[in-house]
Amino acid sequence: MKARLGSLLVLATLVTASNAACSIQRLKRLPNEKSDECTDVDGGKHVLNTYWQKNCEWCFCEKTAITCCTKTLIPVSYDKKRCQRQFHSENCTYSVVERTNPGKTCPVNGWTI
């Protein structure tokens, strides 16, 4: 019980610190399925009470659900006529650059998840 509370505290801290949006996938266990692991939507197996990172999300395996929280901030308030956003999958971030000169960054006044 202490381990689970500790894990939930860590997840809550990550969510709060990153201002992340989360989704919860309730688990439907089959009679022959192990109860000490989770199976994600891609068929990946994860040990109970563990974290992993996939597709720019942090995920956590609980006994009844998998919780995944995005860690990507999306620029929303910038000059959309003069500038465009670029996604960098290697570090799950966006940059906003000029359309005519992609080497020059544009100011961003607001971000969202």
From Swiss-Prot:
Alphabetically ordered keywords of this record: Disulfide bond, Secreted, Signal
Disulphide bonds in the chain: 22-69, 38-61, 56-92, 59-68, 83-106
UniProt entry tagged with the keyword Mitochondrion: no
Compartmental location: Secreted
Leader peptide range in chain numbering: 1-20
Listed transmembrane segments: none
Protein name: Beta-microseminoprotein
InterPro entries for the chain: PSP94
Family that this chain belongs to: Belongs to the beta-microseminoprotein family.
Gene Ontology cellular component annotations, sorted alphabetically: extracellular region
Subunit note: Homodimer; Interacts with PI16.
Superkingdom as given in the UniProt entry: Eukaryota
